[in-house]
């Protein structure tokens, strides 16, 4: 992989990470468009890009993260502890679905040739587009707070 390709892929990752689209999917598409061999760099390169994204997110949101961490160690139950608990609660369905579907998805991806993976990524991006369209036209809910049920 050439340096310019790595820079372009980093820009794609940075631009798409905070949009309601799949940054990993766009990364795969960008690799294909740039003619980058998926095996070159592979998982290490993708992990490096995502680690850089996490680091930049921590830098940007440092004051909020610091407030939550300090609030976690309060002796009395407070808003920060409730918020962190809701974040953890919101991860439970994703973990369950992820661990349940992981063997199936792993075998699916391993059996697909490169163009098949690209087709899968494209299909998932279309599914995301449909879900975002439904969310856009759905009746908005105006809630001041997130309940534990909403978090789950």
Residue map of PLM features:
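Multi-pass membrane proteins that catalyze or facilitate reactions on polyprenyl-/lipid-phosphate substrates
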Residues: 1-152
């Amino acid at each position: 992989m050439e340096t310019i390709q790595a820079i372009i892929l980093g820009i794609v990752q940075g631009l798409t990470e905070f949009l309601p689209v799949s940054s990993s999917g766009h990364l795969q598409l960008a690799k294909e468009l740039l003619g980058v061999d998926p095996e070159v760099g592979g998982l290490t390169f993708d992990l490096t890009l995502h680690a850089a994204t996490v680091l930049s997110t921590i830098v940007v949101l440092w004051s909020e993260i610091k407030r939550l961490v300090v609030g976690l160690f309060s002796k009395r139950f407070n808003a920060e502890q409730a918020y962190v608990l809701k974040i953890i609660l919101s991860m439970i369905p994703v973990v369950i679905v992820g661990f349940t579907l992981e063997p199936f998805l792993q075998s699916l991806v391993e059996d697909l040739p490169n163009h098949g993976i690209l087709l899968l990524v494209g299909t998932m991006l279309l599914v995301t587009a449909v879900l975002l369209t439904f969310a856009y036209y759905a009746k908005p809910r105006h809630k001041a707070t997130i309940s534990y049920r909403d978090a789950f």
